Amino acid sequence: MDNCILEIKNLSHYYDNNGNKTLDNINLKIKKNEFITLLGPSGCGKTTLIKILGGFLSQKNGEIYFLSKEISKTNPNKREINTVFQNYALFPHMNVFDNISFGLRMKKTPKDTIKEKVKTSLSLIGMPKYAYRNINELSGGQKQRVAIARAMVMEPKLLLLDEPLSALDLKMRQEMQKELKKIQRQLGITFIYVTHDQEEALTMSDRIVVMNEGIILQVGTPEEIYNEPKTKFVADFIGESNIFDGTYKKELVVSLLGHEFECLDKGFEAEEAVDLVIRPEDIKLLPKGKGHLSGTITSAIFQGVHYEMTLEIQKTNWIVQSTRLTKVGEEVDIFLEPDDIHVMHKE
């Protein structure tokens, strides 16, 4: 990877003497100007990894190369890496200008340069008239923008963001997702973003790193992670999934609930037991007798954009999402195209 900005090699970390690893042999390459997201449930190790990359915590084993230089023993203030924390970490006794300019003033930057850089940063976050506003007069979203501006004004080559939007309400969070992606593209800074929110990761990322229990399970584009999960955990964690036991009968044919379906996945043995992943939005409902398998709708909930229905087929429950309502008690068939079925090896 010629345009690699950060490489993590065989990195492990544990907090106790029993060797229970918070991070277990992490290997990852990150490209320049990339928006990459560390995604996983609470306790998976993503925040620990961010702290290590920022220099706030030392790993037990492994190496970190930033612009081809090993930085494990480099102090945080000597790394061209800045961090935006979940709690903003703004100075309440300083106004917006002083908060954003704090790092520049510590570096003895000339006053005229500071003024120009802060002005540019405020414009970039859409707050050009807020320079002398007190921090306690700002909304949560505005505080987060100021925290981001304070990090960006130092012109880091890499920006770490540790769940920065988690305290915001849904609408503000969605607006800030768009703003962050826009800012990242304008500045050309590499972002490493931490979240447990799948929608956030899918919306903003160039690539997603899915983590669980201190290990990396899969790295890929949002489309790859969503459409081609490599493990049952990834399939279940990213969006909603129907995951069933099936059999890979022969090349490009699987069996599920006694019916054979065509599929697109290869690399399996004949008669191999497999996991079959079917997304709720990919299931087509047809009149009884017109599809592959028959079942009965047992629940239907309106969720704004679509209806989410539960379909019982041979004592298995299927989650189905559709813009058209099928009433509870109605008998229907399902129809699946080959690309609606994703085949995975059993773990």
UniProtKB/Swiss-Prot annotation:
GO terms for cellular component: ATP-binding cassette (ABC) transporter complex. It catalyses: ATP + H2O + polyamine-[polyamine-binding protein]Side 1 = ADP + phosphate + polyamineSide 2 + [polyamine-binding protein]Side 1. InterPro entries: AAA+_ATPase (IPR003593), ABC_SmlMolc_Importer (IPR050093), ABC_transporter-like_ATP-bd (IPR003439), ABC_transporter-like_CS (IPR017871), Mo/tungstate-bd_C_term_dom (IPR008995), NA-bd_OB-fold (IPR012340), P-loop_NTPase (IPR027417), PotA-like (IPR005893). The keyword ATP-binding applies. It is found in: Cell inner membrane. It is a peripheral membrane protein. Gene3D superfamilies: 2.40.50.100, Nucleic acid-binding proteins, P-loop containing nucleotide triphosphate hydrolases. Keywords: ATP-binding, Cell inner membrane, Cell membrane, Membrane, Nucleotide-binding, Translocase, Transport. Its EC number is 7.6.2.11. One of its GO terms (molecular function) is ABC-type polyamine transporter activity. It comes from the Bacteria. Its main location: membrane. Residues 6-238 form the ABC transporter domain. The keyword rRNA-binding does not apply. ATP binds at G40, P41, S42, G43, C44, G45, K46, T47. Belongs to the ABC transporter superfamily. Spermidine/putrescine importer (TC 3.A.1.11.1) family. Part of the ABC transporter complex PotABCD involved in spermidine/putrescine import. Responsible for energy coupling to the transport system. The complex is composed of two ATP-binding proteins (PotA), two transmembrane proteins (PotB and PotC) and a solute-binding protein (PotD). This is Spermidine/putrescine import ATP-binding protein PotA. It comes from Borreliella afzelii (strain PKo).
